[in-house]
Amino acid sequence: MLITAIAVIIVGPLVKLESPGPLFFSQKRVGKNGRIFKIYKIRSMYQDAEERKKELMAQNEMDGLMFKMKDDPRITKVGKFIRKTSIDELPQFWNVLKGDMSLIGPRPERPLFVEKFKEEIPRYMIKHQVKPGITGWAQVNGYRGDTSIRMRIDCDLYYIENWSLGLDFKILFSTIFKGFVNKNAY
């Protein structure tokens, strides 16, 4: 929590200077046993991002429900930096303290994606038998952001089926030593 507090003290004013509005962003996610909870992040987009998304749909680089574009104009300059370095994810330590999440586990998805993926990906719902995590086996293996959901699920299932304290330490140390830099973040 100390790291989160320091990051908020440093990054917070920069976020607010570039884009008025709340410092934090929350979104509904699906957790253990399908329970819905609010995940917290430092806001990386302009306040009107959802409205602007409608104008940009023709430039969507993803199929289906997901929306991604390389130089998304909805993301602030500070937002690009905090996404690349995963600083935007630090408020999720609050989710860990609340009991919604664990440090390590499969990343939680939004409810609309869960509905889609449970129909398309065999064994997808198994990931909801454990608490979601801030980092996980998929993330330390490079499957973050704009990577295949199927590859992330394969990693999540591997983690669940092979869980051990040793594997958790391996993931934790890999996260720390590889750094929090997300090459797949836009």
What are these regions (language model features)?
Residues 13, 26, 74-77, 92, ...:
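Residue-level recognition of specific faces of alpha-helices
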Residues 1, 9, 65-130, 171-175, ...:
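A short, structured surface patch at a secondary-structure boundary
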